[in-house]
A protein has these predicted regions:
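Short, well-structured beta-strand-loop connectors
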Residues: 69-71, 75-76, 110-124
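Short histidine-centered loop motifs in beta-beta connectors
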Residues: 80, 95-119
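Short glycine/proline-centered loop/turn elements that form peptide/ligand docking sites
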Residues: 109-111, 121, 127-132, 136-140
Length: 171
């Protein structure tokens, strides 16, 4: 019985308490639970070619213009704003040495220091791609780039995505 209660607090039900100011579960324990930050078609995957001679350190999702971007996990906003050729960049500290980088949005609606919850709207996509490295693709729609890091090193985000996340576009 106690085991079932502990399991309920660390599973998807733990995300429902919207008054939290700390992650519901440790990021390392969230494998298979995280929603994609925007629905869309995956056009580049971790470890594949980045289109400009390098290796992709995250995933790229083509979305609809104006699509809402949500947080894939609980965390603290440590950066929110323009960065080099990435368009608007959002960096979340997910705890335990994990950071989530989300780039390519047109507008960000959260502030540095803010605690955000899984699924919380944080940004909006523009009408075209904002990420310069994506220009090497044939994508004509906006592209969101998502990268997970552990202790500063990019890691494959694949194991964290929820199995029921489809590659459908929502706007």
């Amino acid at each position: 019985e106690a085991k079932a209660a502990a399991s309920a607090k660390s599973g998807p039900a733990a995300f429902k308490d919207r008054s939290r100011t700390t992650p519901a579960i440790a990021f390392a324990s969230a494998k298979g639970l995280l929603p994609l930050p925007v629905n869309g078609n995956k056009i580049r995957d971790f470890g594949g070619s980045d289109g400009v001679g390098g290796v992709q350190k995250g995933i790229s999702l083509a979305s609809k213009p104006g699509a809402q971007v949500t947080t894939p996990c609980d965390g603290w906003v440590v950066y929110a704003g323009p960065f080099r050729s990435y368009g608007q960049l959002l960096i979340l500290n997910a705890g335990g040495g994990y950071h989530v980088l989300i780039a390519g949005m047109e507008r960000i609606s959260v502030n540095i220091g803010q605690f955000v919850l899984t699924g919380e709207p944080v940004a909006t996509m523009g009408s075209t791609s904002q990420v310069a490295s994506i220009l090497a693709t044939t994508a004509s729609q906006p592209v969101l780039y998502v990268e997970f890091r552990k202790d500063g090193t990019p890691i494959d985000p694949g194991p964290w995505w929820a199995a029921n996340e489809g590659e459908k576009v929502r706007g």
